Amino acid sequence: MKSKRAIKIFTWVSVGIVVLASGVWLGLGQVSGSIKRIDVFGKLTNRPDRVSTAMNYLVVGSDTRIGLTKAEIKELKVGSRKVADGARSDTMMLIHISKKRDKAVIISIPRDTYAVIPAHISMDGKKSIPETPAKINAAFNWGGAPLLIKTLESMTNLRIDHYVEVSFLGFKSMVDALGGITVCSKVPINDPKSHLVMAAGVHRLDGLDALKYVRTRAFDGMGDLGRMQRQQQFVSAVFREATSSGVLLNPIKLNNLLKAVLKTVQTDSELNQGDLVTLAKQIRNLRPGKVRTLTVPLANTNYFTPAVGSAVLWDPELAPDLWNRLRKDLPVIDVVKNKTDKSIKKVDKFKTRTASENPCGSLK
C-alpha cells in the first residue's frame, strides 16, 4: 500500500510553538537540547541570494510509524513498521515569515510536482547522477533533505533558511495535547482508505481521527488537491485553537504541548538557540488573520511526459510571480485603486485563505 503523507499540515504551528516556548518559559538549553538536528545545508552550493530578512522554512512530513501502537497503525490503515521501514516523504509546505514577523504565508507543494532534479551524488556516495526530470518527491527519496532543498531552490530562486521534519506520531501527539481540534466539513466523508466516516457539520477530532481527516482523499474525486485544501483548513483550525484557547500564553499548557511535539520533530543544524529566542519574541503576537494559506499555482494537474508519467505542472506565470514576491517579501494580495472613484479593491490572484477563516463560517 502506498504510504500516506499528511503530516505537513500542522508544522507551521509546531514551528511557532517550539520557537515561542524556547525563549519564554521552558529554558532555552532544555528546549534546544531536546530537538534532533541534522545537517542539510552544509554541502549545498550556488544557492539563491538572501535579499531580505524574511524567513523561509521548508516543512516536510515523514511517514515513519515509529511510536504508533499496532492498534493505531491498523486503525489508520498505513501498513506495518516493516512495510514502511525508514522515513519517506513526498509532501511539503514552504512557510514564509515576513521580515517584520507580523505576517506568514504557507504554500502547499503537491508531491507529484514535475521537477528537474539537479545533478547530485547518490546517497551511498558511489555514483554521480546527472540532472533528471522526475516528480519532486523523488528528490527526497534520492538525496534526502539536502537534495530536496537544492531542487526547490533551483525551481523557485527562493533561499530556504530552515528545515523542519515531523512524523505521524508528532501530529497525533500535538492534536491530543491541544485537547483535540474542531473542524467542519460541508459534505459527509466516507473514505475506506483512511478509515474516516464523518457526517457533514462540526466535529471535535482527537489525534487519531485528525490524522485520518488530513489523510483522506478517496471520497470526493479530487484526490491530492482536495486533500491539500482540507489540510490547509486544518492547519488554520489548529492555529485558531492554539491562539484562542490561550495555549501559547499558558505556561502549563504550552509545556505539555511542547513535550508532545519535541520528541518527533527534527530541524536543520543551523536553527540555533539565538534564532529561536529572537524569533520567539518577534512572532508571539502573530494572529490567524495574518496567516495566509494556498497551493502553489498550477497550470496542469495531469501533465504527461514519457520520462515522468502523469505529474502536476506549476503555472508558468503565476508560480514565478509568487516566488518572486516571497523572495522580495512583497504582499501576495494586490491592492488596486480605482482612478475614477478612488475606491480600493483587493485582488487575490493566488486564491489564498486566512487562518481565521473556516469552510462553514462560525464554529460556535
Locate each region found by the language model.
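Non-catalytic, solvent-exposed segments at the cell envelope interface
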Residues: K2-K364
